[in-house]
């Protein structure tokens, strides 16, 4: 029997308020989107990516064998700071991509099918 828990600590990054309610096409036309693509840690936001990392890291540190099913920026924040990456978007997961940490190294699961 496996126990599991659900936590609000892995909710989406509470980023830019002026993106809420807009389509992706509209968002891509903003100056913030240019910064987001280059170095999102430079954005002035409601919640920094480091703050996102801190709330996710708390779960990671308090559990063994942790599986996070979450939005891309939330998991990327965690991986970026946990692994001390040099560039935020370097190892950004693709949609539905499975990434994991093994021996403090980022690994990617490749579906053999």
Model-assigned labels for residue ranges:
Residues 1, 27-28, 57-64, 100-101:
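Alpha-helix C-terminal capping segments
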Residues 1-32, 83, 93:
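Phosphate-coordination/substrate-recognition cap region in phosphate-metabolizing enzymes
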Residues 29-51:
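Short glycine/proline- and acidic residue-enriched helix-loop micro-motifs
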Residues 62, 81-85:
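Active-site catalytic microenvironments for nucleophilic, acid-base chemistry
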Residues 63-73:
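Generic beta-sheet signal
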Residues 85-110:
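Domain-level recognition of soluble alpha/beta enzyme cores
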